[in-house]
């Protein structure tokens, strides 16, 4: 199964492509789609839509996983990010892909094993899990991370993450989508 991960952003959107064969994950590609911050919003959204569509056509994934929007302190930023995410989802659906959504917490638990991991920890673990020669950019690492989350059964992580405080008290944690103790 080939998975396209997306970390949406209005200026920079990360993408990452993985192949899953059984329990093995193989890196295919990653990068960023950049929009010119000087152009108007509709033009930036079109750049994002076109870029996502092109990535999907180039790498022919079976499905896509995208990071959910978090509510920011600044409501205007949250609305803009939501519009970028919408453009990305439309680009994916336009290519006939099923789209799965994951929170930043689910991504971090799947990749690092800790929901409050910082960007550098996510980059480091993505590099190690995929045997990359160097750290990917933060946007590409998050995109690869959301693809890893989906590949490792991310749909069950939401349920396990909600149990995190109780599991920690019992000395257990979620690691790469599995409960360990």
Curated annotation (Swiss-Prot):
Keyword 4Fe-4S assigned: no
Residues the record lists as binding Mg(2+) 2: 67
GO cellular component: cytoplasm; Holliday junction resolvase complex
Subcellular localization: Cytoplasm
Cofactor binding note of this UniProt entry: Binds 2 Mg(2+) ion per subunit.
CDD domains from the UniProt entry: RuvC
Keyword Lipid metabolism: no
Binding-site positions, Mg(2+) 1: 7, 139
Matches recorded under Gene3D superfamilies: Ribonuclease H-like superfamily/Ribonuclease H
Entry's Gene Ontology BP terms: DNA recombination; DNA repair
One GO molecular-function entry: magnesium ion binding
EC number of this enzyme: 3.1.21.10
A Pfam family hit: RuvC
Active site location: 7, 67, 139
UniProt keywords, alphabetically: Cytoplasm, DNA damage, DNA recombination, DNA repair, DNA-binding, Endonuclease, Hydrolase, Magnesium, Metal-binding, Nuclease
Predominant location category: cytoplasm
Catalyses which reaction(s): Endonucleolytic cleavage at a junction such as a reciprocal single-stranded crossover between two homologous DNA duplexes (Holliday junction)
Subunit text: Homodimer which binds Holliday junction (HJ) DNA. The HJ becomes 2-fold symmetrical on binding to RuvC with unstacked arms; it has a different conformation from HJ DNA in complex with RuvA. In the full resolvosome a probable DNA-RuvA(4)-RuvB(12)-RuvC(2) complex forms which resolves the HJ.
UniProt similarity note: Belongs to the RuvC family.
Function: The RuvA-RuvB-RuvC complex processes Holliday junction (HJ) DNA during genetic recombination and DNA repair. Endonuclease that resolves HJ intermediates. Cleaves cruciform DNA by making single-stranded nicks across the HJ at symmetrical positions within the homologous arms, yielding a 5'-phosphate and a 3'-hydroxyl group; requires a central core of homology in the junction. The consensus cleavage sequence is 5'-(A/T)TT(C/G)-3'. Cleavage occurs on the 3'-side of the TT dinucleotide at the point of strand exchange.
Annotated protein name in UniProt: Crossover junction endodeoxyribonuclease RuvC
Organism, scientific name: Cupriavidus pinatubonensis (strain JMP 134 / LMG 1197) (Cupriavidus necator (strain JMP 134))
């Amino acid at each position: 199964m080939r998975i396209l991960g997306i970390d949406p952003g209005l200026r920079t959107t990360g993408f990452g492509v993985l192949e899953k064969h059984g329990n093995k994950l193989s890196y295919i590609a990653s990068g960023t789609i950049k929009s010119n911050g000087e152009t108007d919003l509709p033009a930036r959204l079109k750049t994002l839509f076109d870029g996502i569509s092109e990535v999907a056509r180039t790498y022919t994934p079976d499905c896509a996983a995208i990071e959910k929007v978090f509510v920011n302190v600044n409501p205007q930023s949250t609305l803009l990010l939501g519009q970028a995410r919408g453009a990305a989802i439309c680009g994916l659906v336009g290519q006939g892909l099923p789209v799965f959504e994951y929170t930043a917490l689910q991504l971090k638990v799947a990749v690092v094993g800790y929901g409050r991991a910082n960007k550098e920890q996510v980059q480091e673990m993505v590099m190690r899990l995929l045997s990359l020669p160097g750290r990917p950019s933060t946007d590409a690492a998050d995109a690869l991370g959301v693809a890893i989350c989906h590949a490792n059964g991310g749909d069950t992580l939401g349920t396990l993450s909600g149990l995190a405080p109780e599991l920690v008290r019992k000395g257990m944690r979620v690691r790469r989508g599995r409960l360990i103790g």
